[in-house]
């Protein structure tokens, strides 16, 4: 009978949590908007992954052989297409405002003269940042052309070197460098960004939902509904376990949509073992849920979590080690990396999903996620015991 009573209490907590979520329009909006709209929007925005033939206007004030080579080689790159030549920068700027071009190449009058004098040549490339892929494409294309121009004219610059420098250049053996992308074979921005962002979306929206539900409980005194269950540690454990089971069940479905269906529809790298990803998501969702419940004592209303959590995405991408290598992080950022489940979970997921890693390859992240789950579980029990 005592066991049955505990199961009845757990069932009551689960039903009440589902009811709190399903009857709150704000929570449903975060779930529908954050998971489905946010997830679809990110994938749709970066669906091209890489862009080609970005229209560029040229302002050539040099009218030299070198400037013509630069323009011709830029046009030969797959990323850029020279659509027209403007009389001056103001005309090209108007074309950009009208949407006729996405970038402007400006070559000053002394472009060739500076090279032949042994100085650094200067050119300017303006690109729109309203679509980041255009900016990235033009930046990459211009960098490659600049290196090609440098290789072509470097022998002519030997006359500007001192004798010892000339001897060093003559004795140097050229090295041909060929780069091969091991995982992101298209070198597309979407292939690099989307897998990490999907994990961050799961973390952020889950914390928002927990914060909004517990904030509403605090402001409406809804926590008193658990008073008849008692005040012991066992009741606190059942409250935390019941709430967490609801969130994990919901986000198991959402994770399947974000990490399973969307990569298939938008051709995002998805070479990971499905079982390994499921094994990773278990401690990831549990640690995130326990973290939200542990922090619930600071959520005094349902609006505060939106303001506190919504702006963490860029920082979490950085902390994960995906956009910036862990080896180069200062020690204090490495400490923060091990505090948030999003950082560890995102790095582990990218290894599994985009790099085809095994569970042995993500062992440090996986073990740390379970440790986080245990620590935050203990803290959340203490928080609900105090409540």
Predicted regions located by residue number:
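Extracytoplasmic/periplasmic domains immediately adjacent to an N-terminal transmembrane anchor
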Residues: 1-189
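Hydrophobic alpha-helical transmembrane segments of multi-pass membrane transport proteins
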Residues: 40, 180-262
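Short helix-terminus and kink motifs of transmembrane alpha helices
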Residues: 105, 140, 208-216, 289-297, ...
